[in-house]
Amino acid sequence: MLKWTELAYDFYQQGYDVLLFDHRGQGYSQRIIPQKGHLDEFRFYIDDMAKIIEKTTALYSYQAQYILAHSLGALISTYYLANYDHHIKKAVLSSPFFGVPMKHPLRDEIIIATMMAFGQGHRYVFGKGHYKPADLNLNELSHSKTRMKWMNRVNRKRAAIHLGGPTFRWVHLCLNAIKALPKIIPRVEIPVLILQAEKEKIVDNKNLEKLTALFPHAESMLVPQAKHEILFEKDN
C-alpha cells in the first residue's frame, strides 16, 4: 500500500477519493507465514476485497466507483468483478497477473504438484527466499531509480512489510486461478482497459491477447519501454 502513496496523491489532487488496501500476506496485512508469499485459498483474496469495498460503499454514497488494479491485484479484481454484485463503472488492469512465467512449464508444474502432494506447499519455490532490497541497476520492476530507491528506504524503515518469494502453495493456487480465467473473464460486464508493459519479465503475457479478447468490453494499451511496475515507472 505504501508504494502507491504517490499515485494516490495524484488522484486525490484530481478530486478523487482513494481507497487502498494490502492483500492478506502483503504490506501491513497479517502474514500467514512470516516473510513468505503464502495463501490458504485463493478465494480469500476475493472475499477480502469484496468485504472492504462493501463496507466502504456503505459509509459513502459515491455516484461513481472505479478500480485501478496492478499485477496480482488485477487477477483478484477480475474475479471480484465477475463474481460479486458491485457498483464499479470501469476498471484499469495494469500488468495483470494472467500468466506465470516458466522456462519449462510441464516440468515446473510437475514439480509444483509433487511438492503439494508431499505436504511441502509452505516452502519457497526453488530459487526464492527472504526479502532482499531491489537492485537499483538490475531489476525487472522499474527503470525509475528514484522510486526504487525510495521503496528500498521505506522497506528498510518498516521491517513489518518485508515480503520474500512465493511458496509452492501460493503458485499452485494462482496457477489454478489463471487457468480458470477463460470461464471467469466473460462475466465481467463493465469496460476494462488493460495496460501491458513492453519490457515485462515478472508476469507471462503469452496469452494476454487471447484473454483480453474474452472480456465483453475491453481494450489494451502497450506502454513502450515500461517494465512490470507501469505505475511506478520513470517519468517521461
Language-model segments: which ranges?
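Conserved alpha/beta-hydrolase
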Residues: 8-34
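Alpha/beta-hydrolase active-site loop
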Residues: 39-57
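Alpha/beta-hydrolase fold nucleophile elbow
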Residues: 60-71
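Alpha/beta-hydrolase-fold enzymes
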Residues: 72, 76-162
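Active-site nucleophile elbow and catalytic-triad environment of alpha/beta-hydrolase enzymes
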Residues: 165-184
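Short beta-strand/loop motif that positions the catalytic acidic residue
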Residues: 188, 194-196, 200
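Conserved alpha/beta-hydrolase "acid-adjacent" motif
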Residues: 201-207
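Catalytic histidine-centered segment of alpha/beta-hydrolase-like enzymes
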Residues: 226-236
